[in-house]
Amino acid sequence: MSSKVRSLCEAAALVKDGDHLGLSGFAVARNAIAFSHELIRQGRRDLTISQAIVGMDADILVGAGCVKHLVYGGGSLDRFGLVEHINRAYEQKRIVAESYSSLAVCFRYLAGALGVPFMPIKSLLGSDILKRLYEIAPDSVREMDC
């Protein structure tokens, strides 16, 4: 069996412009900083980033102009402040930002891991988050009767 181990450069080279990446971490903990820097160095563009709590890695990718679409459940740089690049890019309409709750993003990951198209949750019902998602990404959310 061949090894799955890759150098950082080789791993980043597998990512193509327009790909959708799921990042882990939380604010400033366990972020993929070196990987993000390598994506920037290799000049990736038009990426979609999903992250339950956006952190420094997503912020630097947005700041470098690599991200077109962000799917996230809030975030900050914890004691270091706000995610300035993300906030600025959103205000200037340089990125599309789908803001969910962190739980909703995690359930999206769970649905993908289970190989199902969606995972029903009730936590967004009656929230402003759901109202905004209907405006920004109407194909990403649905209400259903059970």
Spans of model-derived segments:
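Conserved alpha/beta enzyme-core scaffold
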Residues: 1-146
